[in-house]
Amino acid sequence: MLEKMFKLKENNTTAKTEVIAGITTFMTMAYILAVNPNLLSQAGMDPTAVLIATCLASFIGTFAMALLANYPFALAPGMGLNAYFAFTVCGNMGYSWKVALMAVFFEGIIFIILSLTNVREAIFNAIPTTLKKGVSAGIGLFIAFIGLQGGHIVVNNDSTLLSYVNFRDNWHTEGICAVLALIGLLLTAILYIKKVKGSILIGILATWILGMICQAAGVYRIDADAGFYSLYPTFAMTDFSKIGETFGQCFTADFHGVGIMNFIVVKLSFLFVDMFDTIGTLIGVSDKAGMLDEDGKLPNVKQALMADAIATSAGAVLGTSTTTTFVESSAGVGAGARTGLASIVTGLLFLLAIFFAPIFTAIPGFATAPALIFVGFLMVSAIVKVDFEDLTDAVPAYLCLIAMPLMYSIAEGIAIGVISFVLINLICGKRKKITPLMYILAVLFICKYIFL
């Protein structure tokens, strides 16, 4: 049955590999169960309700991806989009969270229409192959940077923006976390090189267990004010009645005092970031998995984009910010995921997480950091496929690559890559390389920087 539904042999994988990879993806994404409720609660939403909505939206989106597209991509409320929801729309603009949810719902509906009319598929296919390699490598650097932050290996510095962690001054918090993350990275790399099945998942679990041992020995110390909590999982149950506080509330939004133009700007902002984050993630992860054809196209991209659109609208109704395809899916791909069976496993774990949320939210950032850093390395390898003899191809790919981690946005990296590709090739007399849709995208990106 599994073979017929997911074509395991055709994709050179096994059920065991897919299950392990699906668990790996979930483990690297589990932080969203802690982060999303925390962020959206600052917009006035009930954190338990947001937690349940996050689990359900992730389950729906990931299952849709598995059943519609048969791809090992997992979905959840997107980082960055949830911060924009809480701090910009509900914070600086002063709108209620119900109005913000309505904007997300409309964005999802627009995406469904765009997916049905092949617009999003056309955008995906219009991006040149060389730029897709830059996107893939850029995402690798981006998730490696996220891992370095989560592992407390790089920390904030007022003078240089970033610096290496000071082990001596913060040994019992940041220091020991960074050491554990580095040990986990070394362990993951060795296991992967030795071709041990589930090496990335083993790395996550081993690092977490080492952390709990350090807490028991007094080496790791809890400092809640600084964001360092107990590493032991708890077994409290979730209050399911809370979901009523967010479910369907987007339809009760009071638009009194909400300017139509401001609402359109909010909707377009959600639309822009979600669209190109998703396209960028699909390019990067599918390239790493070897799913792109000779022309750089993804066979079932229309179905994948439809799953993403459905998840966004469903998430808004349930009570969470924009649901999107997660770049952490690359961790599962690195562990061998090639079909929707891995997504089924990840989706089921999100559903189960509703009942055991405190256990999954106990997974610390330093435990998932090795997975993100190592998978980042695997994805950066795509850059070797860029033709560095043709600078009109290489320079845009390079700009795209460095923009993603430095601007902390996949969408911004794609924007910089598209604009630079069009301008460089246009000015250098290589207009035949530029498709009409690339011209349109470049103009839209430039307008976005001017007006949004």
For each feature predicted by the language model, list its residue ranges:
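Helix-loop-helix hairpins and the membrane-proximal interhelical loops
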Residues: M1-A49, V165-D169, I204-K302, F445-C447
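Helix-loop-helix junctions within the multi-pass membrane cores of secondary transporters/permeases
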Residues: L2-N36, A57, G78-F87, G91-I139, ...
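Residue-level signature of catalytic and energy-coupling elements of molecular machines
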Residues: V19, L39, I123, G198, ...
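Loop-to-helix transition at the N-terminal end of transmembrane alpha-helices
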Residues: G44-F63
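Membrane-helix interface/capping residues of multi-pass secondary transporters
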Residues: P47-T48, F73, W97, I410
